[in-house]
Amino acid sequence: IVTGDWSSDVCSSDLILEPIQGEGGDNHFRCEFMQELRTIADENDIMLIYDEVQTGIGVTGKMWAHQHFAAHACSDCCCGEDSSARPDIISFGKKTQVCGIAVGKRVEEVEKHVFEESSRLNSTWGGSLVDMVRLTIYLELIEKENLVERANETGSYLLNSIYALQEEYPNLVSNARGRGLYCAFDL
């Protein structure tokens, strides 16, 4: 990506990826990679979009997986304190039982963007009052039951258990990795 041609004659408007690739083999990106994407997006007037359909809503031990890549969360990596991997747009769904898009202020730089007016074109049945009430209740429960922190604590236990299996069976279990409850290993 860093050596790619990002000149103005290349028609790129967005960088879209999952902060942790689920269907792509459970690939956990390094902090530096995610922050470099933010730099590339900023330097080339490109929107950085995270697909948090599988990784969002607390499963990784943070409300959004991309929050693991913020400068304050990456103090153990080589990124500077002022670096960040913040997205311009987040897509989410599954755990909320509604599909959604969270949009940052950078979208306002785009003339006549689709978020200026309310629309239901992004989902056949989405956006109903029932959906909004259900989502509100889910978010209240997540906060009340402290589910994000509990996912972080339980995930730490799970990952440590996988590390123990990896140590006990090195020819069978390898590449233990995870954030919160979003853990994996190779067989």
Sequence positions of predicted segments:
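Single conserved hydrophobic/aromatic residue that forms the stacking wall/gate
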Residues: 1-11
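Conserved PLP phosphate-binding loop immediately N-terminal to the Schiff-base lysine helix
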Residues: 18-31, 45-80
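Surface-exposed amphipathic alpha-helices with a cationic face
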Residues: 34-42
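Helix C-cap/helix->beta junction micro-motif
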Residues: 43-44, 169
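Active-site PLP attachment segment
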Residues: 70-114, 127-132
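Structural motif of enzymes handling amino- and sulfur-group chemistry
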Residues: 125-146, 150, 154
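Conserved PLP-dependent catalytic core of the aminotransferase class-I/II
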Residues: 145-187
